[in-house]
Amino acid sequence: MARNLRNRRGSDVEDASNAKVGYETQIKDENGIIHTTTRSLRKINYAEIEKVFDFLEDDQVMDKDETPVDVTSDEHHNNNQKGDDEDDDVDLVSPHENARTNEELTNERNLRKRKAHDPEEDDESFHEEDVDDDEEEEEADEFEDEYLDEDSKDNNRRRRAADRKFVVPDPDDDEEYDEDDEEGDRISHSASSKRLKRANSRRTRSSRHPETPPPVRRALRSRTRHSRTSNEENDDENDNSRNEALTLADEIRELQEDSPIREKRFLRERTKPVNYKLPPPLTASNAEEFIDKNNNALSFHNPSPARRGRGGWNASQNSGPTRRLFPTGGPFGGNDVTTIFGKNTNFYNQVPSAFSDNNNNKLILDSDSSDDEILPLGVTPKTKKENTQKKKKKKPEIADLDPLGVDMNVNFDDIGGLDNYIDQLKEMVALPLLYPELYQNFNITPPRGVLFHGPPGTGKTLMARALAASCSSDERKITFFMRKGADILSKWVGEAERQLRLLFEEAKKHQPSIIFFDEIDGLAPVRSSKQEQIHASIVSTLLALMDGMDNRGQVIVIGATNRPDAVDPALRRPGRFDREFYFPLPDVKARFKILQIQTRKWSSPLSTNFIDKLAFLTKGYGGADLRSLCTEAALISIQRSFPQIYRSNDKLLVDPSKIKVKVSDFMLALKKIVPSSARSTGSSPQPLPELIKPLLADQLNNLKNKLDYMLNIKDTTFQRNTSLLQNFIDYEEYSGEEEEHDKYGGNEDTSSFRSYEFFESMAESQICKPRLLINGPKGNGQQYVGAAILNYLEEFNVQNLDLASLVSESSRTIEAAVVQSFMEAKKRQPSVVFIPNLDIWINTIPENVILVLSGLFRSLQSNEKILLLCLAENLDISEVKNGILSDFAFDKNIFQLHKPSKENITRYFSNLIELLKTKPSDIPMKKRRVKPLPELQKVTSNAAPTNFDENGEPLSEKVVLRRKLKSFQHQDMRLKNVLKIKLSGLMDLFKNRYKRFRKPPIDDAFLVHLFEPETSNDPNWQPAYIKDENMILEVSTGRKFFNMDLDIVEERLWNGYYSEPKQFLKDIELIYRDANTIGDRERVIKASEMFANAQMGIEEISTPDFIQECKATRQRDLERQELFLEDEEKRAAMELEAKEQSQENILQEPDLKDNKANEFGVAAGNQLQAQLQTTINTASIVNNSEVPQPIDTNLYKKEIPAAIPSAVDKEKAVIPEDSGANEEYTTELIQATCTSEITTDDDERARKEPKENEDSLQTQVTEENFSKIDANTNNINHVKEIQSVNKPNSLHETVEKRERSPIPKEVVEPEQGKKSDKELILTPEQIKKVSACLIEHCQNFTVSQLEDVHSSVAKIIWKSKSAWDKTGTVDEIIKFLSE
């Protein structure tokens, strides 16, 4: 329509009659419809016309903004305003326009008629690619000649010629189009630019005359930048163009002239060269598409030029299955692509395709959510019920307001040695709940607070947990709140106090409840002027909450601390902390019970005697230390029984019932464990060592008797740490006080009080100022005696005042430390104030400190059980009686340590005489293993509890693998998405910067035959490109291409094909290698640049953790792919079998068996290959002509030496009878008999060994050669004779296991482990001589000097422990003593 609405010049009234005649003419089309004009037969592309209008409107807006105001145009507008008002439909025509002749118009119409509509080329009638370049130029020149003068015409021609010479087409602009499109663009370039020039000139005229817009001529949008640029440059030039107008007469004359009667017929003129290139053969899908395209040639649903020119014949594949050289499928799509190199595998489908009927839902991932379940037809999904109740507002006040879950597995039975405290806690918690009437009878309130204090690891926290668990039951629940200082403190002012209030309110709501403050010394320290105000406020709040105006109900507060002196004193009073439980280090009985508790659940529990001895050895161990000791002993027993599990990453099959803890395990654990009490400074309580007992045992017994007399320990009726309940259970109540109450002249109650007072005063009067000073020569074992006395007084509270304890804390003075220790001793009586090294102490400590301590002891009553125990060396007695120590009253309680007597020395050195008389064979020594450790079997994956089905039967390995892969599926999908996002930046950069690589080096149209096996197998077909392994071979040149492009890379990326960045980099490298193969310099440079950018970009996004996760995901993808291929093979086999069954009713059994035998899965490939190799190797060994002759067993008996040690098991080792042959002859004989696998290099190395190791070397050669003989002659019939005589199988198995064992091979030494009847060369006279020399030499020696002599003599004897002749040892001892 736009082409027909052309501007005509002038109008002739005479043509009206011709128009009338034209209207009366009737024309019939193909469908029989009558038309009166040819205009109705023309098909109009309204979409293109609308685009032209939009284009013109945009240009008009631009022209209005850019066109300057022209005075002449305004005058012309004013002059023509009158004519516009008279007739709006008639445009103004200049005289110059009227000068156009009818002959010119006729020629122009004839040129337009040559472009008549052709039904077969409907798609070409609306696009500028089919316009003849020469005719368009001629038409444009004639059109411009109508309005321009001669000078303007010449200028326009010169400018167009310069433009065509100057403008060079940009190759990058048309990279994405095919060659046909580029050719069409070049043809239509000049025509479209001319049309745009005419459109611009009309826009200029329309802007000058907005009242009468002329009819719009056809103006196509240019597809190149050059045409648009030319239009913009020529806007100013077209402003001076003449105005044109279309009158009604011109329109009527055009309708008359378009009549088919007057139209001349022109034959089709070919303007394009003939293309004799044969297209690729049509495939099945291409043929259907081609037929459909021809049938629908008259339709308007034609693709755009860019789409139509892309792909050529292969473009029709878009509606069918997509074809690619490389697989692009992933979990996000691309699995419907037919590939040549590789295969698309949708391995993210969890249900095997062989067992699934719905294969179209492969991309639907499995979900564990019930919302994703497929519902039956007609069933609506269940909607979540909204909670209509009013939701409770979550309390944001305290983060840890919820009570702590009580561990019901912990109870009082798990606590040993604290029976007294357990009974007292029960009467605080359980008894008020069970027997409230007992408390109401006396109108009392049970204690509501208790403070646990003592050394670390003594069971304070365990006691609180056991209390909550033991007192809770199904009928009554006790809520347990556990808080630490960090849970309460806050940086906001007043927040900590608010937290405490909320905690007590919550505990009161859930009463009965227990609040346990662990490490309460950090929450409520001692208030002082130097302390921060925040702690003082917290302490005040806690004091008010524990015992304020409000009754807190059945809320029990328990505090635990290691430093009771650091807790504020206001808390340590009845009403707040009613009771204070001191958790001391457990004594022997408590340790015995704790060890029983820790080992009672063992499969092989320890005996009572064993635990008793162990409890005696663990002095100073707390509850936590004893538990750690049992754990270490059990781990050491595991290491001793199964060391293989520490050298293997796989789970091995072990029998736990074979593991038993022995004495050696506990002894090793005792060396490893350091108890908590041993970490502190000063001497810790320890019993007298066994080695020192002969020297100090007698004097220590005398000290114990003296302490019993001083403190009256045995006559004490009740001790604080013992259970009062147990006392009432064991003893009856005293019944004589009712009968004797009249003797005291009062009633029953008064007499009872007087009776108790009398006997208590008599018992206390036996204690009077307990002081004890142990003095003796220097180095006479004072440290052993002091530790042994503290061990004997383990029920006493010990306060150590040694120098290290007093000066360790720089923040306090020595006087303060002394006063604090004394006050603690006074609170917890009976107690001991221990001062070691008193002689050094009085010379170091200032005199005022000694006076302060003496003043404190003076303030004590004489019957208080506070023992002052001091140790000294060579202290002057006069100084004790009359000097500065006289105030301590050591006059009568000074114990003098004497030097060991002759009898003590004789018993002390008796162990050395026993060591001297010990045979080397009786000395326990570490023996090297004779046999290697047995190889433990690996536990299969089915042993895990999750690898069993509902019936408890183990699942197969493949099912277990599928479950494992399914569990990682969501994680792998998430990682692929992360990888896509990280690589998307590089992908966008490559698409925009390197457009040349968006197409492969070889067009897909030339590779269509690769997808058709029938075509490729045709001998008459000679393709230009063929497949060569994983590359495309160009037959003419012999070059090979990978044919990778960026479109494939992008498709792979967004489909989730890549699991790790190196896959993406590998595809970019393929593009780079193809560029090198082509050899184009610019292409190689661009490809190298792209490859470098890819390398650096991937290196930036690659972190070690991310790469590790990507590798794991890649490995799982390979496993999924393997399972998928195996399922596909099974499915194909099932389909084939079903097809055969449909064709044949009865299958032959041999054929069926053969088919089943030939079906192998993917996972069975390695096993099948290994079996085939084994069969081939066996057959080659048997059929080989170089197999050695049968071996003479007698020859081995005579010639092979027997150098195997006696410790080797005779049943599993080969011990030849004769060992007289030399080593060289043996090696040569074995080499001649064995196969070629045994080389002579070992023999040459064996000859170079020293002669000292001939025996061991000969043994190793014999074992290795025997194992090789057996390994290489395993399939020979004559081997049975050798096995029957020499039994080489057992040796071969032993050596083979030794090589496979992770533990290195160890050979026993010949002299170790032998027990012989050989006697020592040691006479009784020599023993007596040594004993006499020792006693004579050590007369008047102190304990320290005796220890020195003992150590030196023990070294001499131990050095010659393996010698049977002790004469030299005796002489060396006597020589040492004489010196």
From Swiss-Prot:
Q: Which enzyme type, at the first EC level?
A: hydrolase
Superkingdom of this protein's organism = Eukaryota
One GO MF term? histone binding
Q: Region entry AAA-ATPase: which residue ranges?
A: 450-578
Q: Which residues bind ATP?
A: G454, P455, P456, G457, T458, G459, K460, T461
Q: What is the effect of changing S370A?
A: Severely decreases phosphorylation, causes a G2/M transition delay, and leads to sensitivity to 6-azauracil (impairs transcriptional elongation)
What does the record say mutating T380A does?
Severely decreases phosphorylation, causes a G2/M transition delay, and leads to sensitivity to 6-azauracil (impairs transcriptional elongation)
What is the name listed in the Swiss-Prot or TrEMBL entry for this protein?
Answer: ATPase histone chaperone YTA7
Its organism's taxonomic lineage begins at: Eukaryota, Fungi, Dikarya, Ascomycota, Saccharomycotina
